[in-house]
Swiss-Prot record:
GO terms for molecular function: RNA binding; structural constituent of virion. It is found in: Virion membrane; Host nucleus. This is Matrix protein 1. One of its GO terms (biological process) is viral budding from plasma membrane. A motif (Nuclear localization signal) lies at residues 101-105. It comes from Influenza A virus (strain A/Turkey/Ontario/7732/1966 H5N9). Keywords: Host nucleus, Membrane, RNA-binding, Viral matrix protein, Virion. It is a peripheral membrane protein. Belongs to the influenza viruses Matrix protein M1 family. InterPro entries: Flu_matrix_M1, Flu_matrix_M1_C, Flu_matrix_M1_N, Flu_matrix_M1_N_sub1, Flu_matrix_M1_N_sub2, INFV_M1. Pfam families: Flu_M1 (PF00598), Flu_M1_C (PF08289). GO terms for cellular component: host cell nucleus; membrane; virion membrane. Residues 1-164 are annotated as: Membrane-binding. Most abundant protein in virion. When expressed alone can form virus-like particles in transfected cells. The lineage of its organism: Viruses, Riboviria, Orthornavirae, Negarnaviricota, Polyploviricotina.
């Protein structure tokens, strides 16, 4: 896996699924291929995107700034600076300075990532902030190692909270989680269907699932009633994907 492919993989792991994720993936590919060289326009586009957390926007802004050639005096963007300030916690800033000193001694992507992984996401974001604000300089490869370590910490935390959600014993939480997952799967089916001739069935299944979830939320039902909802949807999606010759990896 090339360095830029690895960076793209890690960055996209913290972006919520949906049409915006596909759009961001395309922008990253264009930037890494040298096809998009207008940093100002890119940053303005990023700033106004919905759904993304401030930290995710900050990380993407940092990656764009590292990659797109720009005039030396180009002004730094406030939304990126605010996102990469470690929540204003002085402890994060102290750790960021210590990490920065270690990163200065690193020359490889993997070396930098390994060093950075022992720090919290807050300290890592602060360290990115130091570099973004030109208070310190490291090689692009080392900066990318820092980016990927930060994304890994965030993705691990999201994964842990997802696992806790799945294994929780509270039936009301599990019920709501099943409905949320069913809605997400329905959305995935609609996105995959597009305008193909075989799409009618997938759209119909997705539409029925949405109506069922809406009805459950509106009138209230027993928590066990949603147990098969997500599984039925996934089975329908898998059957549809087999017919379309699409692999199931994205929506497991």
């Amino acid at each position: 896996m090339s360095l830029l492919t690895e960076v793209e993989t890690y960055v996209l792991s913290i972006v919520p699924s949906g049409p915006l994720k596909a759009e961001i993936a395309q922008r990253l590919e264009d930037v890494f291929a040298g096809k998009n060289t207008d940093l100002e326009a890119l940053m303005e586009w990023l700033k106004t995107r919905p759904i993304l957390s401030p930290l995710t926007k900050g990380i993407l802004g940092f990656v764009f700034t590292l990659t797109v050639p720009s005039e030396r005096g180009l002004q730094r963007r406030r939304f990126v600076q605010n996102a990469l300030n470690g929540n204003g916690d002085p402890n994060n800033m102290d750790r960021a300075v210590k990490l920065y000193r270690k990163l200065k001694r690193e020359i490889t992507f993997h070396g930098a990532k390994e060093v950075a992984l022992s720090y919290s996401a807050g300290a890592l974001a602060s360290c990115m902030g130091l570099i973004y604000n030109r208070m310190g300089t490291v090689t692009t490869e080392v900066a990318f190692g820092l980016v990927c370590a930060t994304c890994e910490q965030i993705a691990d935390s999201q994964h842990r909270s997802h696992r806790q959600m799945v294994t929780t014993t509270n039936p009301l939480i599990r019920h709501e989680n099943r409905m949320v997952l069913a809605s997400i799967t329905a959305k995935a089916m609609e996105q995959m269907a597009g305008s193909s001739e075989q799409a009618a069935e997938a759209m119909e299944v997705a539409s029925q699932a949405r109506q069922m979830v809406q009805a459950m939320r509106t009138i209230g039902t027993h928590p066990s009633s949603s147990a098969g909802l997500k599984d039925n949807l996934l089975e329908n999606l898998q059957a549809y994907q087999k017919r379309m010759g699409v692999q199931m990896q994205r929506f497991k």
